[in-house]
Curated annotation (Swiss-Prot):
Names of required cofactors: Ni(2+)
PANTHER family referenced in this protein's UniProt entry, alphabetically: HYDROGENASE-2 LARGE CHAIN (PTHR42958), UPTAKE HYDROGENASE LARGE SUBUNIT (PTHR42958:SF2)
Enzyme superclass (EC): oxidoreductase
Organism whose genome encodes this protein: Wolinella succinogenes (strain ATCC 29543 / DSM 1740 / CCUG 13145 / JCM 31913 / LMG 7466 / NCTC 11488 / FDC 602W)
Subunit (UniProt): Heterodimer of a large and a small subunit.
Reactions performed catalytically: H2 + a menaquinone = a menaquinol
Family (UniProt): Belongs to the [NiFe]/[NiFeSe] hydrogenase large subunit family.
Cofactor note: Binds 1 nickel ion per subunit.
GO cellular component, one term: plasma membrane
Protein name: Quinone-reactive Ni/Fe-hydrogenase large chain
Keywords, sorted A to Z: Cell membrane, Membrane, Metal-binding, Nickel, Oxidoreductase
Enzyme Commission no: 1.12.5.1
Length: 576
């Protein structure tokens, strides 16, 4: 007899996501469904607006990936108008991307995903002196792991526990059987969790140097950047470099070491050795380091075969809505995408409750529509995007920087290449992508310094002919994977706009053929230890770093409400 488990909401992510799974009598997941429960609708808001404003609207898609959508909106319009920004502008944008990656991935591992690996209550039982000595096993120069520091961290969290309230650590499945770290290892990660709060603040300041503020920077404009004086001010350049070195140091001495430690301990934990059932990977070049070299490579790897990189045919990219809450079901290219809503709601069913008993709740209509996310496909096939795709495509393309960091990690952990195609591997790949920026971000900085000596231009002039029609797109790899924005311009205003975001590729539903997207496929076949504590589900989904940004209602250009959708509170099976 099968049972259904609903995890709603999936917390420690950006946005609103629920996961439903069907398990058999052995607690093995037989089917899975990914549902985004609120609507964004930003594409509709952009229609009829000046294309030069696109980036300022698109960065409001979410409060985490602000710069990614900002740059995408600006760059899509530049592509449509045939504008090439000066090299200085491109390099400043690279420094902003590097700042974002260092911030985003550090926050994800420690503050969003880390508690799926680290048992906080176990850390309270650790011997700080033993933990301090153990840290040297994973780093020749560990950070925030002195015996006195670890004792202070332990005492700080113990004070929360003594009051019967673990504060930010209160809502989790502590003591779960799939936690594998020793108390001392948990204490090391806990110390780095707290240290990362300081590090992410510095990384945000790096972005603000070039973008005026973070989140929602303001310095990009169609044609270039406006942070001209910052690029010419030695003190601002030095400030960015100092902060960059500080954050990069943490990545190499803490983040890298902690993932190496996780690889050693969790390589025998079955629940993290699967989680990658769509082995098609899509990456696109991003972060120019100079006139000719990019940090990331472009291409598609199919069926996990890293001996071949397929060139991208953009005409094969489509989105369909057979199982999404939109009226138009057929597969459309993003230039022609539609987003007229068609919300059909949930149905009643019994599911496994928090105490393991069956409870009545609302579940999706799995044969109908069940999410606000469309199903992107490439030639009819699902693709995974994100750091794992960056590393896999980079290895297949023989990208020297990616080869170096990935090869060193596999050597340090003793893991085979096949281990990358797992939940553990996906988590490691995000760290490796962060390490790429930590190890090679200075190349873009040095290129900017060198180019400013001979050329100080930061902007390319242009005109928009209102009698012409334009179309263009941005495509590039951002922290959560390949992001693309597609724009049509007519009569000097935006006629149509589509954003195909990384979590669209990964979190999308099955298509008309019943083929699952990466989230859904990643859960099938995994065994749960305890149906009332589905930590394994949380860990797999968090490894993708979900970003389900959305809006509840949409306004037309005159401020009139077009539609409003209320998502009723759902009695859920499990919360985390």
């Amino acid at each position: 007899m099968t049972k259904r488990i609903v995890v709603d909401p999936i917390t420690r992510i950006e946005g609103h996501l629920r996961i439903e799974v069907v398990v058999d009598e052995n607690n093995v997941i037989q089917d899975a469904f990914s549902t985004a429960t609120l609507w964004r609708g930003l594409e509709t808001i952009l229609k009829g607006r000046d294309p030069r404003d696109a980036g300022f609207f698109t960065q409001r898609i979410c409060g985490v990936c602000t710069y990614s959508h900002y740059k995408a909106g600006i760059s899509a319009v530049e592509n449509a108008l045939g504008i090439k920004p000066p090299l200085n502008a491109e390099l400043i944008r690279s420094l902003m991307s590097i700042s974002l990656i260092l911030h985003d991935h550090t926050v994800h591992f420690y503050h969003l995903h880390g508690l799926d690996w680290c048992d906080i209550t176990s850390a309270l039982k650790a011997d700080p002196v033993a933990a301090s000595k153990l840290a040297f096993k994973y780093s020749p120069n560990p950070i925030a792991t002195g015996a006195d520091e670890l004792t202070a961290v332990q005492k700080r969290v113990a004070e929360f526990a003594a009051k019967g309230n673990l504060g930010p650590f209160a809502n989790a499945y502590w003591g779960h059987k799939t936690y594998r770290f020793s108390p001392e290892q948990n204490l090391i990660v806990l110390s780095h969790y707290l240290k990362a709060l300081e590090v992410q603040r510095v990384a945000a300041q790096m972005m603000a140097i070039w973008g005026a503020k973070q989140p929602h920077p303001q310095s990009l404009t169609v044609g270039g950047v406006t942070s001209v004086m910052d690029a010419l001010d030695p003190s601002r350049l030095g400030d960015w470099l100092t902060k960059y070195k500080y954050v990069a140091d943490f990545v190499n001495r803490a983040y890298y070491a902690d993932v190496v430690m996780a690889a050693e301990v969790f390589k025998s934990e079955p629940s993290v050795l699967g989680g990658c059932n769509v082995k098609n990977f899509y990456s696109y070049q991003e972060i120019p380091l100079n006139k000719t070299e990019w940090m990331y490579s472009t291409g598609i790897v199919m069926d996990g075969d890293i001996t071949k990189v397929h060139e991208i045919n953009e005409d094969l990219i489509t989105e369909e809505a057979t199982h999404a809450w939109y009226k138009e079901n057929k597969a459309l290219h993003p230039y022609d995408g539609q987003q007229d809503p068609n919300y059909t709601g949930f149905k009643d069913m019994e599911t496994v409750g928090p105490d393991g008993t069956m409870v009545k709740t609302k579940v999706i209509d799995e044969k109908g529509k069940y999410t606000w996310i469309k199903a992107p496909r490439y030639g009819g096939k699902p693709l995974e995007v994100g750091p794992l795709a960056t590393i896999v495509v980079g290895l297949a393309a023989k990208n020297p920087r990616i080869e170096k960091v990935a090869t060193q990690f596999l050597k340090d952990t003793g893991l085979p290449l096949a281990a990358l195609f797992t939940t553990l591997g996906r988590t490691a790949a995000r760290m490796l992508e962060c390490k790429l920026s930590a190890d090679y971000g200075f190349e873009a900085f040095n290129s900017l310094i060198a180019n400013l000596k001979v050329d100080q231009s930061t902007y390319t002039t242009y005109k928009i002919d209102k009698n012409k029609e334009y179309k263009g797109r941005y495509m590039g790899t951002v922290p959560r994977g390949v992001l693309s924005h597609w724009v049509r311009i007519k009569n000097g205003v935006i006629q149509n706009y589509q954003a195909v975001v990384p979590s669209t590729w990964n979190a999308g539903p099955r298509d008309a053929n019943g083929t699952k997207g990466p989230y859904e496929a990643s859960l099938v076949g995994m065994k749960l230890q305890d149906l009332s504590q589905p930590l394994e589900i949380i860990r797999v989904i968090h490894s993708f770093d979900p970003c389900i940004a959305c809006a509840v209602h949409v306004m037309d250009t005159k401020g009139n409400e077009l539609s409003q959708y209320r998502v009723d509170p759902i009695t859920v099976g499990c919360n985390l």
